[in-house]
Amino acid sequence: MALAALSFTSCKSDLLDTNPTDQVSGDTMLKTTDGGYMALNGMIRYFWQWGQTTTGNYHQCFGPQSYNLMADLMGEDMVMSAQGSGWFWFDYLYNVKSRWNSTAWRSYDTWNYYYTIISNANYIINGKEGMTGSTEDIDYIIGNAYAFRAYSYAYCAMIFARSYIGHEDRLSIPIYTEPTFAGTAGKARSTNREVFAQAMSDINEAISLLGTKAQKHCSHFDQYVANGLKARIALYMGDYQTAHDAAAIAVKGGSFAFNKDFHYNDATDKSVLWGAEIIQAQGTTNPQFLAHMDIRYNNGGGYGGKARKCASAWLYNKMAPNDARTKWWNYETLQDNTTKGYQQWKFLFADPANTYTGADHIFMRAPEMQLIIAETACRLGNESEAKAALNELMKTRQEGYDCSSKTGTALGKLTTDETGSLLEEIILQRRIELWGEYGRVYDIKRLRQGFKRTADMGHPVAALLNNLHTDDPETFDWVLTFPSKEVDANKLILQNPTGSYPTNEDLEGDDPSKAPKTE
C-alpha cells in the first residue's frame, strides 16, 4: 500500500501526517478518550483542509466539496462557462484520467484522500480495546471512525469503479480494515459487492455505537447523519427499502423548509444535518468551495468570476416561474461580456470581502433525505407516499405544486429523454434541489442512464464531449484511473482504462478474471 502509517495530531495543529514524526504517536494518543477525540477531530479537518493530498493543483483539492464539484461538472446540469484559472476545467473536459502518473492530478489526489481517511479510521477503531474513559465517549469516538470509513469506501468506489447496479461483481477498490504502515503489502481490488458490503457493515456499526448520543459538533456523525449516509449508500446500491428507512430517520434531524436567505455558508442552518463551521483561524482565500462559486469574490476577479458556474438552460427551464429556487440562478452576461447564461447565486460567501468566516462547509441537508424517501417509496410501489413526500417538500418552494397526476417509474435512456413518470419528476426535483451539492455523475451512474451535452444547454464547444461515450452506462468515462504510485507499489492492482473502454482487457478494466494473481 502506498500510504504510510499515520501519527495523530491535535486538530488545532497541522493535519494528520502521513509520514512518521516525533509528535505523539497514534498508539499513545489512543490510550485515552481525550486523545481519541484529538485523533477524531484531526481526521475531520481533512474534510476542509487543502493542499494535503497532492504535490500541486492545491486549489482544487479541498475535501468532499471539491470532489462533489468535480462530479457535478462531469455531468450535464452544471455549465462551466470558461477555463478561468484552470481549476476544475480539466474535470469538466474529462481530461484527467491520462495523468495518472502525476502526483498533482485527480487520480492521486482522490486516492490519497480517501485512503488517508481510511487509514486514520483504522487506527482509531483498532485503539478501542486499549482506550480508557467512559463507555459513552469510547462508543462515540469509535462510532464516528466507523462512519468516516464507511463514507470513504463508498465514495472512493463511486469514483474508481463503475456503478454498483449492473457491476456488482466487477472489480472496485481494495479493502483495508487493519492499521497500515509504510511497506504494508498491497491488496487486490475487491468487487463492488464486497466494498459496499464493507461500507454498509461499517455504517451499521456506527449507528449501533452512536445510538441516540447528541452530536458534539456539526462535523461529527450522530444517528441522523449516520442514517443519512446509510441512505445514500443503500440508494446507490439499489437497496431501496434500506435507503427509505434510513432516510426517514435522518430527515428528522433537520428542516426542509425553504430559506431564501440561505446561501450555503452557515453550517448552523436548520436544514443542515452535517457540515463544518470554519472559524477565522481555519479560514482561507482561494482554495475553498465558495471561492470557485461566488462571482463577487475579489471583485469578480476570483475563480468564481473567471470561470462562472451556471445551470444548464435545459434544467433551469424545467422550473416553474413561481419556483422560489429560480432565484438560485440569474440569466445574465458572463465573463466574456457577450455570452449569457444562468449564473449561480445559490452559493455565496456571507461577506465576499472576508473569506475567512461565513464560509462554512455543508456536507448533508435534510431536503436530500426527503427526496430519497420520495424516490424509494416510488420504486417500492408506494406511489401515494412518494407523492405526499414530494408535495410536502415542494409546497415550501413552489406554491400550488402538485405531482398527484404522475405515475410510474420509467426513465429515459438519456437524462433528457422524458417519459413523464413520477420517478422522473422526483429525480428532476433532486437535480434542481441538490445542484452543486451532490456530485451529479454519481446519480447518472446509479440510474443507469447516459447524457449528452449541447451548446443549447450553455456548454462551451470545447466541453461537448463528442469523442466520449457518456450516453452509455457501461462506459469507463466516469471511472478514474489508479495513480501510478499505487500501481507501482501494489502489483495486484488491475488498472482502469484511460479511455471509454478497455483496449486490452488483460491489462486494464474491471474483469475479476484478469486481475493479477498473488505470487
What are these regions (language model features)?
Residues 84-160, 190, 207-213, 356-361, ...:
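Conserved, well-structured interaction surfaces
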